[in-house]
Amino acid sequence: MPEFGKEEIANLTKVVESGVFCDKRGGFMDQFRADFSQALEAKHAIAGATAMLLMHAIPGAIGAGAGDEIIVDPVVQFHAIACLHNNVIPVWADVRPESFLMDPESVKRKITKRTKAIWVTHLWGFPAEVDTLRQIADEHGLYLLEDCAHALMTRYRGRYLGNWGHFGTFSFNMGKQLPTGEGGMAITNDDRLAFELNRRIIFGESPEVLSSNYRMTEFQAAVGVAQLKRVPGYLEIFRAGKAILDESLAGCSWLDRRGEPPDSQISPYFWSCLFHGERRGVEWGVLRAAMEQSGGGFQFGFTQKPGYLYEMFRKPNAYGNKGCPYNCHLYTGKVDWRPGMCPVSEDVIPRIVMTNNMALREEEYHSKAARLKEAIKLAEKGEVKPLEYTELDRRILKAIKEQGPLEPLEVIEIFDREGWGHFDEHTMYGRMSALRSYYPYKLSHAGPRKFAYHDLS
């Protein structure tokens, strides 16, 4: 958890006493913008209520709209959602297997006459190859946009992330490296782009362009001014914690530490490694069960699949069920997102092992490292206890065994019909995933969200 103290309280008190909670000339938002741009060595900093809202406004600021494409990476999908909000088609480029970051060679293959920009994610505080991506963007007359939500004060080849592209966006929600509750900041070194973004996020009675009201409040900025001073100290602790977690993999040949780009100083957000159990004959489910047995604290497989396989992207229903924006008459391309489009992402994402890398106490990192070491030992020795089935598990297995591959909603319908109780889709999917992923893995995948009975006995 972040630290909050006397300066945050004093700043918030000043806001309350001023009686002006937003748009205060010379107030905390003006100070926060100035301090942030100076800290990141950028010319302009534009504050918003959230980073996502700033991302929503950026395609319009660069002139992207109906008929255009923006190339994105598929491990997360926030930039792709921002594209759809602007009637822009996100086009998915693959990632590097060792870093999970956008692959410039894949980007080159995705560029068309419709491409307007490249939007790269610095996933979990690791810098993507923005020098190469900027070169590609310049060669093709494209904008380079950076999602730096996880990568505050991350340097790559001597320059802070966010400054390699035409825009860089940063998130200040409670789970980020500079928490203000909610909030975001965009940086740019281009006067025209700063003007275009500003007029899309704050307007009065007569806006000149399609705009909204995405202001940051004085309360958020007051906390941000104080928290910005704490960030270097936070990052020092996070980097030391990452080193402790990295060391826990010493001697393990089947969990690969994530590749760290040369000439960079990362800002750890999530720590991660990649599962290669086939090198030692260790099953994925066995590691998960071993981790639970040793105390847990790690997530397995992240979202399980790349963004383009999410239902919301596969169906053209961004605006009701009108077929927009994929079937827009201004769009001359074809949307056909299906498995196999980004093979590296599809292979890597389900094999990611990860945990939060933003604890402020060193003992928390040592505890996690010890649990991971113990899980590795249990998995290698085969000393893993099988998953203990609940009544819910037994009924799920019965339904799928008797009625064939099923999706969570289909299992819920059977439960309702049989009077076995009603469960929401999230809970049902979680239990079905556990039965697939934990020893003795009674289910297997039969589709993106479909499970089949898989008896290994």
Q: Where are the language model's segments positioned?
A:
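N-terminal "arm"/small-domain region of PLP-dependent enzymes with the aminotransferase-like
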Residues: 1-22, 354-355
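PLP-dependent aminotransferase-like
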Residues: 60-139, 143-148, 155
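Charged low-complexity interaction tracts in eukaryotic proteins
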Residues: 423, 429-457
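Conserved active-site segment immediately N-terminal to the catalytic lysine
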Residues: 146-178, 205-208
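Short capping segments at the starts of secondary-structure elements
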Residues: 401-409
